[in-house]
Amino acid sequence: MLSLATLDLLLSISESELIEEMVVGLLASPQLAIFFEKFPRIKRALMKDIPGWKQNLQQRIREAKVPAGLANEFALYQQSQLEDSPLFYAHLPQIVVQLQQWHSPFATQAKTLLHTADLERNPQTGDSFQTLFLQRWRVSLTLQTITIHHQLLEQEREQLLAELQQRLALSGALEPILATNDGAAGRLWDMSQGHLQRGDYQLLLQYGDFLQQQPELQQLAEQLGRSRSAKAQPTPDARFEPYTVMVRQPDTVPEEVSGIHQSNDILRLLPTELVMLGMSELEFEFYRRLLERRLLTYRLQGDNWQEKTLQRPISLKSHDEQPRGPFIVCVDTSGSMGGFSEQCAKAFCLALLRIALEDNRRCYIMLFATEIIHYELSSASGIEQAIRFLSQHFRGGTDLAACLSSTLSKMEERDWYDADAVIISDFIAQRLPEELIRKIKIQQQAHQHRFHAVAMSAYGKPGIMRIFDHIWRFDTGLKSRLIRRWKR
């Protein structure tokens, strides 16, 4: 069957102009104009999608098929073009009858032209009438094809407008919460492609309002997200110079008792050794041990400061900003994290998502209790993932070791090699295995991974929290909440 794109080519119809006209008309619609005036960032993000729209419309036209009646009429038109004048005039009455049977829009005009020519009384010998007839026929075919284009593009326009209105409503509602610059607005626009209704993302708006009511929590998230500072790097041809530092080293300086050992130091003898001198039968044993340096004496030890010479570069010409990697956020969903702590933990993750969108970073959420649940909030379906995450309830146990093990495994993946781990918990948990602590230290020292702790309680175990590079404290207890409210 004849395709619409082929018919455009044969009739020299520019489909790109028709598509451009449709897109301009769509963007000029009153609904979009009002929205663009209110949210200019979303408008700039939407404009980047226009080339994709045009490609999709062109593909839709290529796939469209011409109706059978129009295809047959065009085939008859092509056949008539190839006929010489005598043969064309002989077939003309049949052509008019055929057009009438197909209910062609050109049938009435063709019949009028046939009666005007009156071929029976005035036989035509030239090709002027044939040229006029074919020109009028071609115009009719072009109009029919353009009409099909308009019908097809109008359907696509209505569908696209409905989709845009839904995405614009979602993006407009979430823009104050998640989009702080053009880059974040663009990523938010890309994430709004899912089929979400207003009731679906209402939970995001609620936690956005809660975050506004907790400025200290919002400030804490900003500090954590921006905490990676610039690092000075020596240039490859930098010259080095010696410099001297004082280094503390353990020495035998008599500062404090550090234990007992065998020696011949009479001044530091244990009382039990001195007893042998008062007994004649053990006196020779005492002298024997003295010569062999085997008398039990106190060991005194202290610190001795010595000079040490090191090398350092004379000039540091570059200060390379350390790249801000993605977030791997582990959220404790145990029963002790319920209530206000749960609200704060979810709002804190929402604040980290906003920072990730602003800095073009990825944000991965892991919920740990008796099992581990994963969400990637910065993916194409990030809004749907965020809604599912915010809908979770914290009623499980605490398995911090399993969560940290999963975090280490995630960091070994290529896309998460430079990630920062953020653990949100009250840290009322069991002691971590020594092997796990050793692996975390390797990641911190060898790969410069950073592990942050966001402590939601003042009663977290110090032994657990000692492994983290930085501890951000936000006590959710009633006393701390009242103090924060009083200071505002």
Curated annotation (Swiss-Prot):
Q: Which InterPro entries match?
A: Uncharacterised_CoxE (IPR008912), Uncharacterised_ViaA (IPR023481), VWF_A (IPR002035), vWFA_dom_sf (IPR036465)
CDD domains found in the cross-reference section: VWA_YIEM_type (cd01462)
Q: Which UniProt keywords apply?
A: Chaperone, Cytoplasm
Q: Tell me which domain of life the UniProt entry assigns to the organism this sequence originates from.
A: Bacteria
Cellular component annotations (GO), alphabetically ordered: cytosol
For whether the record's keyword set contains Chaperone, the answer is yes
Q: Where in the cell is it found?
A: Cytoplasm
HAMAP family tied to this protein: ViaA
Q: What does this protein do?
A: Component of the RavA-ViaA chaperone complex, which may act on the membrane to optimize the function of some of the respiratory chains. ViaA stimulates the ATPase activity of RavA.
Query: How is the subunit organization of this protein annotated in UniProt?
Result: Homodimer. Interacts with RavA.
Name the protein family. Belongs to the ViaA family.
UniProt-recorded name of the protein: Regulatory protein ViaA
- Which species expresses this protein natively? Yersinia enterocolitica serotype O:8 / biotype 1B (strain NCTC 13174 / 8081)
Which gene holds the coding sequence for this protein? viaA
